[in-house]
Amino acid sequence: MLETVTDVASFVHYGNTSVFPTADNSSEIIPDGESNISKPHRCLQVLYDDIGTSRVRYWDVMLLIPNVAFLVFLMWKLPSARAKIRLTSSPIFVAFYILVFVVAAVGITRAIVSMTVSTSSAATLIDKVLWEITRFFLLAIELSVIILGLAFGHLESKSSIKRVLAITAVLSLAYSITQGTLEIRFPDKHLSAKDFNIYGHGGRHFWLASSCFFFLVYSLIVILPKTPIRERISLPSKRSFYVYSGILALLNLVQGLGSALLCADIIEGLCCVDVTTFLYFSVFAPLIYVTFLKGFFGSEPKILFSYKSQIDEPEDSDVHLPHTSSSGLGRKDLDRGSYSSTQIDGSGAYLDDVVSGPFGGAHSINSVDSDRWRSINT
């Protein structure tokens, strides 16, 4: 009798179907307020509830809207972004920009396809495969960002970037295959509703192990600048990279705690992993953009062009090889300076210091008398 009561209570707690005692066994079950629950936990229900009579789930819409909004933003910034990317010699910015596009596109594709499938067993399998494909791309990008961020100053060629992407793709594929095998062959019974088996990220135990692993990785990255290793290797100086790592460390910590609660059969842990799953699959791409690309794309194009034209002028000998006398300045040099006010305003004081140097103030550019300039012009 005790076993029968336990089975019924467990099923109605996680499933979506009420179980009522029949006439044969009604005397064996004494209903009370706790065992007569007809609805699953709200944190489980949000994962599969449909909008009205449609087959579209709230969960898919919640994940679709942020990805669509971010993709629209990327398309809006695309013309100016392409113009700025052409000006940089570093392939890392190009790689990051392509990666965020891929993340947004894959997230939208998964949500749309999941909305169109039914609740049959084949549709459930398709939905889980789409989740694994999305997770594969996200993890590949996540690992690539870690490596490229830590080795930002050491990877300057396209071939090295491609090698990093290839390595992270292989690692992500191995992870996704393992997770997908556990998810399809050994689905988590805690995430079953009606005839629809909800995607469980490989089960509670795999979820817990992976969350703890990534929490340790990102926590180590955050504390690296405080360790003696900073004197042996070159670490990123950009503060936003460590903020990014700290956010993901916190995300994996909460996800690990939620998974641990699920392993202890505490259904409230599902609320934690619901929040972390939503944040990861909807906010991860914007986080990469803000961390690594916002500052680069936020600069004005003319500044980049102006900087490039200044460093590429081959005949600007005044800065690199200053004359010891102002009489060495020819008419050609003066004429060229007339249309480059930025260079004059920005470097006039510097040239005064360099030219006057050990020769005193008599030969300073700004202290040359008008008679000397008049004799040069004539």
From Swiss-Prot:
Keywords: Glycoprotein, Membrane, Transmembrane, Transmembrane helix. One of its GO terms (cellular component) is plasma membrane. This is Transmembrane protein adipocyte-associated 1 homolog. The keyword DNA damage does not apply. Glycans are attached at residues 16, 25, 36. Residues 316-335 are annotated as: Disordered. GO terms for molecular function: G protein-coupled receptor activity.
